[in-house]
């Protein structure tokens, strides 16, 4: 009588365990993603002149600009500061998401997951 399951996989009981592990990982990932949606990353540029908050969903939540940095004669500097703060906050959010999801996936990089 032939063994059930895939060749080299040790039969059906091991496949059942693998499926349970995958289902547990999926649930853990969903919980982690929900928790990440509630977290925020903050970054600033220009010595705190511009402050940006980004969510765990990698969406900009807020941008704060100190009035003293608003110079109609130098809009380009303000644009550069905003861009720097947004990019830094996005990098921070990406690192936070990768770290938290890495705990769930055991460090496996699953494309398109987060």
Curated annotation (Swiss-Prot):
The keyword ATP-binding does not apply. Its main location: cytoplasm. Keywords: Cytoplasm, DNA-binding. GO terms for cellular component: bacterial nucleoid; cytosol. One of its GO terms (molecular function) is DNA binding. It is found in: Cytoplasm, Nucleoid. Pfam families: YbaB_DNA_bd (PF02575). Residues 25-42 have a biased composition (Basic and acidic residues). Residues 23-42 are annotated as: Disordered. InterPro entries: YbaB-like_sf (IPR036894), YbaB/EbfC (IPR004401). Binds to DNA and alters its conformation. May be involved in regulation of gene expression, nucleoid organization and DNA protection. Homodimer. Belongs to the YbaB/EbfC family. This is Nucleoid-associated protein Amet_4780. It comes from Alkaliphilus metalliredigens (strain QYMF). The lineage of its organism: Bacteria, Bacillati, Bacillota, Clostridia, Peptostreptococcales.
